[in-house]
Amino acid sequence: MADIKHLIANNKEWAEQQVKKDPDFFKRLVGQQSPQYLWIGCSDSRVPANEIVGMAPGELFVHRNVANQVIQTDFNCLSVIQFAIEALKVRHILVVGHYGCGGVKAALESKPHGLVDHWLYPIRDVYREHAEELEQLGETEQIDRLCELNVIEQVKNLAKTNMVQEAWDKGESLTIHGWVYRLDNGLVNDMNVSVSSREGMEQVYHVYHQKLPKGG
């Protein structure tokens, strides 16, 4: 345990600093959480959800996986979405990828990666659908463009889930957004695919099938 003692020390220092800045900080956290936002992002350790959008603990409900995917057979992700919509009553769902994503890069490689290859298969489908455009780009630009297309694909997948469809049918206020985060400057690039109704899906498909300017 010697190699992680510094983490315990860091935790103690962090807790003390929080109380010093705000004596009621932890008292508020004990109550029921009521975030207005669900963040579905990549597991990459360089993409800290709360910090990126300047939100404190309790203000952002977070789910992360490799390459920020929403897959209809992933009960972990689907359970998070259902809980966020039905129990927490979130008003916005943010699908957030990041440029230079290792998962997206791995999906483009021909060498095997073991179990993760099954997880990345949907990204390869996105590549095949946009191969004509992507094959004209250099390696870095190709990865970054696929990161953008993957986010838009996940917005589409999320909008098709029963939980989202039912919320819209009930007239609930729920908007899905697609962003891509830049590691080199800390800014998010809005893919302009926000959708808040079944009818709004037409705009998402329109953006998905036209060439977008690269972020930044």
Regions flagged by a language model, labelled:
Residues 1-35, 67-91, 102-216:
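Divalent-metal-activated hydrolytic enzyme cores
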Residues 18-59:
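N-terminal short beta-loop-beta anion/metal-coordinating cradle
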Residues 40-42, 64, 94-98, 177-182:
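Short beta-strand segments
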Residues 48-76:
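A glycine-rich, hydrophobic loop/mini-helix early in the fold
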